[in-house]
Amino acid sequence: VVRRAAQAGIKCVPTGIEHGTVTLIVQGHPFEVTTLREDVETFGRKAKVAFGHDWRKDAERRDFTINALSVTHDGIIHDYVGGFDDIAAARVRFIGSAGQRIAEDYLRILRFFRFHAAYGSGAFDATGLAACIAGRGGLSQLSGERIRAEMFKLLVTKGAAHAVEVMSEAGLLLILLGGVALPHALHGMIKAEDTLGLAPDPVRRLAALSLFVREDAERLASRWRLSNVEARRRESVVWRFPR
């Protein structure tokens, strides 16, 4: 990929070269390109991979069926795991064994909720939800940076309020936040944003969702690696927003 990009005069940035991923800059727009891969060993956080040539194996190592589609240069879609039907049904479903996919990288628990909040409709996939609950203890293995990045993406989705409510019922928020969460307050914040014409803001929504107790809030800021500005913004919103 690097060689062909150079031959075509396309800027290539080695954003994740150790994982086979580079970013190509075309007319000012970034496009991630990743070599086909197979999992060699998984650690519950990130996998050790080998590069390959098999599109089916590359698809089967991914998290959700809707993430495993591929398309040829002439527009033919290849679907090895039923992703096209799941897209049509607005359904987020793990590939193969949900428990095994989660054990490969526990961040997939958060991705399950984010993808449903962004692209899903109706009830969560029951098998996937049960596997997330069973594997929730693995969330403690994740770095704060990865949790923060994924949760910030989740909090600004169209279905964030419902997803967070289900996460709370499943016992995930206590692990992630380190204290009691207030999903109903997130509902209120989203309504307030809509009324005032404000764009979704992850820090503002986190403030509505999270903690009154200062010690808990400080642990959250440390655990999630919030910047000083983000931590101060979260705290200022907490004390202004009615619960």
Q: Which functions belong to the PLM regions below?
A:
Residues V1-R243:
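Catalytic cores of the polymerase beta-like nucleotidyltransferase superfamily
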